């Protein structure tokens, strides 16, 4: 019986083994998770280098933060370095194996050269003998010749970027400032990597695996990847649920490092947030605790892999953060001796995961995203929004929501301030004269994200028009939406609607006062003045009424001058922001928060309202009999209240130019009447211009037949004889210039780089001459106390040649001089060096097989002591495991 069972088991095992043997393993794209950290090596200007290990082989892994590259505007330099190393297959250039990336970092996996850099060796030696310096310069010259023949300019050549191999040969590295000219504007492809041999017969040393080739041709992303579809994200995350749970248990945060008490409540928050956000991997989670104020949870995605690893990025610091490839795994923590969360805390936190999963099970990803999003239209939040917000409160304890912060702008004038935010964010009511229906253009843009910042004003305005939704019965609609929103959103929405209604009633009353002299039989539906003008004037009218004429006494406006403000117009678009005269007041108020909106908006718009006349009066002029009376009456009242100012403004005729706001769009269409005026029609108009300070406060085309001018002058006297033209360019400052920045180390910069001229491969030969002088003397030729003095020495070519016993040989001095030639066209290159007497004994064809004067003798394969001399000389303290 047992034997039979055993035989059956064996036969079944053979069947399973045969099936497994027939399966073809699917190769996985390379991932940074496959590498383990051994120790840090060095730190440069654009990243840190770590000693990594994979499959028993050591690699040098350069880690570059994407955020730093974005802040320094050098994202293209990281791409250039990757491409330059990927294209290079030379024995004198560091070999690049992988190019990987995650959500936060870019990883360049290169060969590890145990001999350190030449700068460290130079600090130990003091200076090199002529024979040693010639060999090093010869190998670097071959590397430069190879790069230049393949369209690559290094532009950062210095001893720090020359590494020493195990045999003592030189290899160039750090192509962060390199310039690649492939005569095309696309990224490198597979053919570029496979067909770039370093010699006539490519050796096996330069062959790459398919995974390496795939990683080297992948595109680098420097922005957070957008959220994927529900189906795709579900498929990706379903394969990593167990990995995600392990990751959440092994997280290292400042709280755990500081040995603070971790309560079950905080663990519940952590796990509930991680569990909830898995429905949308691209959605950031903010403020899990006060200690993780700036932490964000993102998807760590390899550049060439579709695998996604969930992680929580803690507050990075030199003493707490650890690279661990952004996944603070428990295995790495045990190896490095780091403090991890205790298992009893993990058990407590895992118990709460099922409860939180039940709460989030019925939620839709779209609903939860809309609930947490700071920029959305609250009218589209479904009925489950209240539950989502309740869950959000669990994830964000102690964090004031964005709606509450908007309401706390001014504790005294909540309604007024909120209304101003609403009106200046394009929430406007537009009346259609044909059917009398009202449209509401809703754009709740209280806070901007990167997409809003990058978008142009024209795109925003077009989007405003597309987002218009009908509100035929405002009260019923608002009541219907109240039942579908949370209490906080309802308060904001009700406040906005009620204020809009009160503002509209105010505007309607004031409009009746302005239009009292217009034809009595004209119906409101046929009124040529769009209702948007009334809404725009509500702010000014409210300022005048609520401040009890506080500022009227100090200004030159009379009581009747408010009528002019009712018909204020904008030069191009009256239904969208950007051209309104109130824009300047809003900008000033944002710069000076202590000053109330009433003060800034009212004080800056007094003169504007005085001289503003609606162009719509051109189509509906006053009756012939009432015209003169209205003009005389208004003119006399204006003169009575502000005679001195008007005399100053109108004594001399001024040519005016119609300006537009910087945020206004030029070619976008609009349905309001004033926007239909063409630019050529401005020639026939009288334009009034008033300046206050350094910018025009009001520039509005005056009405053809009626002009507010002193009664001593006739309208014919203010006609302009000069054609009015818009400026040809409104850009402030100098136009952007490509490669305007001076990048590199000051001592090794060529004169053409300092002068901002066009440069080519000759800049590398100049730097090679500086390195030759430094190898022979131990000090760069143009070294000085400050960078400015170094630049002056370079431009003057001030070289302090050694004298006496330290004097250089004539051949060495001449070689330095031909390399350090100011005229880049006459500067020496590889041909001149090969023919120079200093390099007469160099076997250029078999240079990589020659015995080098210095061969490193490390203690073991992980010895990094040869890099310490440079770090100590530059006072670089490489912390344990901080990025």
From Swiss-Prot:
Which residues of this UniProt protein bind ATP? 41-49, 62
- Look up keyword Transmembrane and say if it applies: no
Q: Where is the active site?
A: 156 (proton acceptor)
Protein kinase domain location is 35-839
Enzyme class (EC, first level): transferase
Point out residues bearing the modification N-acetylmethionine. Answer: 1
Subcellular locations according to the entry: Cytoplasm, Cytoskeleton, Microtubule organizing center, Centrosome; Nucleus
- Provide the catalytic activity annotation: L-seryl-[protein] + ATP = O-phospho-L-seryl-[protein] + ADP + H(+); L-threonyl-[protein] + ATP = O-phospho-L-threonyl-[protein] + ADP + H(+)
Cellular compartments per GO CC: centrosome; cleavage furrow; cytoplasm; nucleus
- Which modifications occur after translation, per UniProt? Phosphorylation at Thr-745 by CDK1 during M phase activates its kinase activity. Maximum phosphorylation occurs in prometaphase.
List the EC numbers from the record: 2.7.11.1
Sites of Phosphoserine modification: 295, 373, 456, 555, 559, 634, 661, 672, 729, 879, 882
What is one process in the GO biological process aspect for this record? intracellular signal transduction
Q: Which InterPro entries does the UniProt entry name for this protein?
A: AGC-kinase_C (IPR000961), Kinase-like_dom_sf (IPR011009), Prot_kinase_dom (IPR000719), Ser/Thr_kinase_AS (IPR008271), Ser_Thr_kinase_AGC (IPR050236)
Pfam families xref list: Pkinase
Chief location of this protein within or outside the cell: cytoplasm
AGC-kinase C-terminal domain: which residues?
840-883
To which protein family does this belong? Belongs to the protein kinase superfamily. AGC Ser/Thr protein kinase family.
Described by its record, this protein's role is as follows: Serine/threonine kinase that plays a key role in M phase by acting as a regulator of mitosis entry and maintenance. Acts by promoting the inactivation of protein phosphatase 2A (PP2A) during M phase: does not directly inhibit PP2A but acts by mediating phosphorylation and subsequent activation of ARPP19 and ENSA at 'Ser-62' and 'Ser-67', respectively. ARPP19 and ENSA are phosphatase inhibitors that specifically inhibit the PPP2R2D (PR55-delta) subunit of PP2A. Inactivation of PP2A during M phase is essential to keep cyclin-B1-CDK1 activity high.
Protein name as catalogued: Serine/threonine-protein kinase greatwall
């Amino acid at each position: 019986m047992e034997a039979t069972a055993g035989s059956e088991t064996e036969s079944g095992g053979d069947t399973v083994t045969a099936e497994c043997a027939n399966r073809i393993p699917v190769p996985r794209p390379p991932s940074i998770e496959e590498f383990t950290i051994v120790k840090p090596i060095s730190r440069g200007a654009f990243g840190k280098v770590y000693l990594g290990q994979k499959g028993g082989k050591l690699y040098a892994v350069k880690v570059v933060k994407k955020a730093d590259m974005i802040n320094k505007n050098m994202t293209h330099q990281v791409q250039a370095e990757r491409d330059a190393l990927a294209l290079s297959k030379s024995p004198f250039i560091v070999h690049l194996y992988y190019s990987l990336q995650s959500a936060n970092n870019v990883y360049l996996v290169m060969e590890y050269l145990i001999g350190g850099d030449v700068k460290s060796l130079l600090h130990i030696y003091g200076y090199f003998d002529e024979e040693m310096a010639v060999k090093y310069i010869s190998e670097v010259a071959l590397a430069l010749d190879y790069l230049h023949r393949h369209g690559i300019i290094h532009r950062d050549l210095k001893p720090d970027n020359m590494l020493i191999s195990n045999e003592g040969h030189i290899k160039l590295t750090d192509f962060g400032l390199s310039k690649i000219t492939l005569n095309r504007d696309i990224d490198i492809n597979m053919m570029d990597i496979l067909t770039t041999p370093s010699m006539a017969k490519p050796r096996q040393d330069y062959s790459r695996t398919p995974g390496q080739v795939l990683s080297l041709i992948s595109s680098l992303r420097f922005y957070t990847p957008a959220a994927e579809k529900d189906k795709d994200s579900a498929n990706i995350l379903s394969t990593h649920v167990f990995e995600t749970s392990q990751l959440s248990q092994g997280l290292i945060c400042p709280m755990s490092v500081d040995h603070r008490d971790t309560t079950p409540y905080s663990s519940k928050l952590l796990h509930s947030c991680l569990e909830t956000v898995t429905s949308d991997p691209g959605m950031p989670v903010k403020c899990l605790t006060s200690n993780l104020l700036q932490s964000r949870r993102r998807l760590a995605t390899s550049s060439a892999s579709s695998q996604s690893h969930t992680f929580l990025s803690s507050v990075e610091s030199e003493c707490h953060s650890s690279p661990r490839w952004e996944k603070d795994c428990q295995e790495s923590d045990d190896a490095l001796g780091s403090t991890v969360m205790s298992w009893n805390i993990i058990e407590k936190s895992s118990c709460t995961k099922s409860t939180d999963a039940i709460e989030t099970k019925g939620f839709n990803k779209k609903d939860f995203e809309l609930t947490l999003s700071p920029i959305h239209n609250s009218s589209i939040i479904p009925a489950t929004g209240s539950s989502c917000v309740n869950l959000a409160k669990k994830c964000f304890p102690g964090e004031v929501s964005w709606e509450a912060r908007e309401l706390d702008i001014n504790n005294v004038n909540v309604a007024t301030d909120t209304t101003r935010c609403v009106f200046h964010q394009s929430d406007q009511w537009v009346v259609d004269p044909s059917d009398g229906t009202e449209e509401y253009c809703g754009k709740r843009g209280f806070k901007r994200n990167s997409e809003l910042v990058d978008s142009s004003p024209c795109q925003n305005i077009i989007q405003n028009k597309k987002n218009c939704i009908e509100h035929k019965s405002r009260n019923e609609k608002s009541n219907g939406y109240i039942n579908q929103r949370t209490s906080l959103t309802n308060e904001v929405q009700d406040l906005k609607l009620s204020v809009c209604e009160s503002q509209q009633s105010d505007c309607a009353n004031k409009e009746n006062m302005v239009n009292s002299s217009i034809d009595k039989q004209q119906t409101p539906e046929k009124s040529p003045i769009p209702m948007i003008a009334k809404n725009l004037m509500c702010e000014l009218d409210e300022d005048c009424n609520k401040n009890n004429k506080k500022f009227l006494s100090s200004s030159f406006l009379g009581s009747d001058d408010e009528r002019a403000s009712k018909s204020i117009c904008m030069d191009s678009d009256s239904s969208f922001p950007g051209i309104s005269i109130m824009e300047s007041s809003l900008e000033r108020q944002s710069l000076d928060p202590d000053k109330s909106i009433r003060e800034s908006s009212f004080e800056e718009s007094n003169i504007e309202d005085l001289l503003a006349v609606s162009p719509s009066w051109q189509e509906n002029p006053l009756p012939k009999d009432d015209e003169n009376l209205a003009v005389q009456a208004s003119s006399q009242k204006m003169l009575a209240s502000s005679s001195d100012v008007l005399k100053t403004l109108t004594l001399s005729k001024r040519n005016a130019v119609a300006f537009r706001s910087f945020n206004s769009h030029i070619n976008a269409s609009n349905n309001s009447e004033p926007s239909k005026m063409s630019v050529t029609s401005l020639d026939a108009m009288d334009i009034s211009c008033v300046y206050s300070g350094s910018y025009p406060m009001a520039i509005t085309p005056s009405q053809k037949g009626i002009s507010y001018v002193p009664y001593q002058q006739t309208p014919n006297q203010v006609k302009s004889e000069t054609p009015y033209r818009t400026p040809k360019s409104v850009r402030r400052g100098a136009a952007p210039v490509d490669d305007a920045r001076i990048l590199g180390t000051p001592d090794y910069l060529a004169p053409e780089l300092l002068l901002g001229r066009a440069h080519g491969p000759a800049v590398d030969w100049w730097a090679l001459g500086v390195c030759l002088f430094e190898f022979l003397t131990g000090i760069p030729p143009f070294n000085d106390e400050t960078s400015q003095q170094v630049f002056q020495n370079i431009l003057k070519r001030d070289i302090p040649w050694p004298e006496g016993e330290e004097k250089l040989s004539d051949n060495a001095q001449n070689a330095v001089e031909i390399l350090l030639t100011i005229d880049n066209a006459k500067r020496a290159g590889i041909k001149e060096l090969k023919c120079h007497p200093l390099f007469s004994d160099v076997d250029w064809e078999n240079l990589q097989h020659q015995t080098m004067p210095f061969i490193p003798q490390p203690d073991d394969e992980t010895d990094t002591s040869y890099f310490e001399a440079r770090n100590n000389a530059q006072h670089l303290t490489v912390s344990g495991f901080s990025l």
